[in-house]
């Protein structure tokens, strides 16, 4: 079926601090605001990031206006209900914006990510001794301003097909939580300096189970294949094939684990398996794809974590398509 109803899902403009306004010559200089950035190179960098992001949004809107499609635009912070009645969602920002969009999508509506402000390697090299000049991460974004119309046309005419990516399902005390994670989840104490106390075991749908592992650690991270290149990889995990339907889990900074438990502190959750967690702190949290979506947990709560979740259809960049299975 032709894709003729499009939702443009955009990162807000005002995500960076504004440049201080110049005071009139006759006015005394105002006191500097607390923690205001004053390095002119940093200010120019932030200004340029806003400019490039706005230009990309305007370009996307201009391209859509030339197509025989119905479309609307919404800022990501204004979205609170599931997305229905569209054939395609276009996220404009970076991976974070695509992840936010995914939380409102079922398995039927594809999403195309546009990296609105890609990192410029020469800029990073030039400024690396002064500040971090990296820009937007777009690992899952198939398009930039340079190729947006080409990728959009291929998507609209069906020559560019979406890939089906696994997501993470979490049940709390047997009840399904409404958010499905596209990247990863983190189960931990809400204070990063506190120890997370919990037990877990891997269990299959046929009833087979690992032995119980009692943990004191910094928490439990579970990643999808799409999320295996993010925090999981930074923590010592491995990159998974993007088309895999397995999950990768890791206990973060385990405290004095038993030798018998060590082989199970990092591994895979295959299809037909889940991780069963019992939480033993007074308070805790499950974070979905970063810090924006969080569900509180308390002592005695159980979590069932698996890939038994609706897939997400994503138009992937060529390098991920070539990764294969």
UniProtKB/Swiss-Prot annotation:
One of its GO terms (cellular component) is cytoplasm. GO terms for biological process: NAD metabolic process; NADP biosynthetic process. Keywords: ATP-binding, Cytoplasm, Kinase, NAD, NADP, Nucleotide-binding, Transferase. GO terms for molecular function: ATP binding; NAD+ kinase activity; NADH kinase activity. Its main location: cytoplasm. The keyword Transport does not apply. It comes from the Eukaryota. It catalyses: NADH + ATP = ADP + NADPH + H(+). It holds the Pfam family NAD_kinase. InterPro entries: ATP-NAD_kinase_N, ATP-NAD_kinase_PpnK-typ_C, NAD/diacylglycerol_kinase_sf, NADK. Its EC number is 2.7.1.86. It is found in: Cytoplasm. It is an enzyme of class 2 (transferase). Homodimer. Key source of the cellular reductant NADPH which is an important antioxidant factor. Belongs to the NAD kinase family. This is Probable NADH kinase. It comes from Oryza sativa subsp. japonica. The lineage of its organism: Eukaryota, Viridiplantae, Streptophyta, Embryophyta, Tracheophyta.
